[in-house]
Amino acid sequence: MSLNQISKVYATALLELAQEANSLESTEEELSSLVGVFFSDDTIRHYFLSPLVDPSEKEQTAAKSVQGKASEIVANFITLVVRKNRFLYLKDILEDYRSGVDRLKNRSSLRIVSKDSLGKEAVDQITKSISSKFGREVRVTEHTDLNLIGGFKIYIDDFLIDASIRAKLAGTREALLQKKIPVGAFE
């Protein structure tokens, strides 16, 4: 089974449980918080990924670490993921879970990537425009990519809107190559 399939299977199972318990949003918040803690601390991440640590010890540690900090659904889910040695997939499971919640709520996930933060006003304007084009509510996350020269990229569902300077330069280059302008034509 591929990484993508594994994370989808676990995310779908959690989604079904959360839907039955009418706790889609709270389950997402709890899972997001725990994944953030697990993957922000190198010691915790290495512990759960280490082949040297006994699997039953990892499971007990996971159960104790989420006890009282998460609902029964999320606590049992984290314990199951650790028991099945799927800890590495938790970030992907979270993303697939979010996508599932978005589908159920007729919502799209919008990711804006830019060199620097665009600011609230620009993000709101982009959100409003995309929301009206797609006819659904949009959940926005903003990321920075220092490799961008300027501009931004928007990822929504399976679409990419590339308004980066690099894309514009590539388009200009391609147009010039298509016209086959001879060298020295602008002298």
From Swiss-Prot:
SUPFAM superfamilies: N-terminal domain of the delta subunit of the F1F0-ATP synthase. Keywords: ATP synthesis, Cell inner membrane, Cell membrane, CF(1), Hydrogen ion transport, Ion transport, Membrane, Transport. GO terms for cellular component: plasma membrane; proton-transporting ATP synthase complex. Pfam families: OSCP. Disulfide bonds: none annotated. It comes from Leptospira biflexa serovar Patoc (strain Patoc 1 / ATCC 23582 / Paris). It is a peripheral membrane protein. This is ATP synthase subunit delta. The keyword Secreted does not apply. The keyword Transferase does not apply. GO terms for molecular function: proton-transporting ATP synthase activity, rotational mechanism. F(1)F(0) ATP synthase produces ATP from ADP in the presence of a proton or sodium gradient. F-type ATPases consist of two structural domains, F(1) containing the extramembraneous catalytic core and F(0) containing the membrane proton channel, linked together by a central stalk and a peripheral stalk. During catalysis, ATP synthesis in the catalytic domain of F(1) is coupled via a rotary mechanism of the central stalk subunits to proton translocation. This protein is part of the stalk that links CF(0) to CF(1). It either transmits conformational changes from CF(0) to CF(1) or is implicated in proton conduction. It comes from the Bacteria. HAMAP family: ATP_synth_delta_bact. Belongs to the ATPase delta chain family. F-type ATPases have 2 components, F(1) - the catalytic core - and F(0) - the membrane proton channel. F(1) has five subunits: alpha(3), beta(3), gamma(1), delta(1), epsilon(1). F(0) has three main subunits: a(1), b(2) and c(10-14). The alpha and beta chains form an alternating ring which encloses part of the gamma chain. F(1) is attached to F(0) by a central stalk formed by the gamma and epsilon chains, while a peripheral stalk is formed by the delta and b chains. It is found in: Cell inner membrane.
